[in-house]
Amino acid sequence: MHDATPLSPERQEELLKHLEDVAHRHERASEIRPDQLQALDRLIKVAQGCTGQSALLANFLLAWQHAPEYGGFDLKDLWGLDFELREDAVAVLGMIAYAQRSPESLGYAEAFGRIARAWREGDPDF
């Protein structure tokens, strides 16, 4: 059996500080920032269009909403976006990863419904 060497008070303090820093970063990362919501609004607006970039963004957003129903998203498709839209997609991806919230929980059910009807159901009134 291996005897563990006790940590010095300095090392204990250092580890505690590190854990507090990690917890603080996690807490901050899970907060949704206004710039992320603005990026999401811009992506939704483009996804409601009828261009190639609109189709890519519809796939991206609908994969977030419900990938088993609407299909996944190939991350290499981000390469097909203009720089500004790619930056917005990365901001939204960060929000998705850290905030762990669905579009519906953020008040976007109606907008995502319009995108789904247009791109998955061929709604002529889109």
Regions from the language model: what does each represent?
Residues 56-67, 91-95:
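Short, hydrophobic/amphipathic alpha-helical patches that form generic packing surfaces
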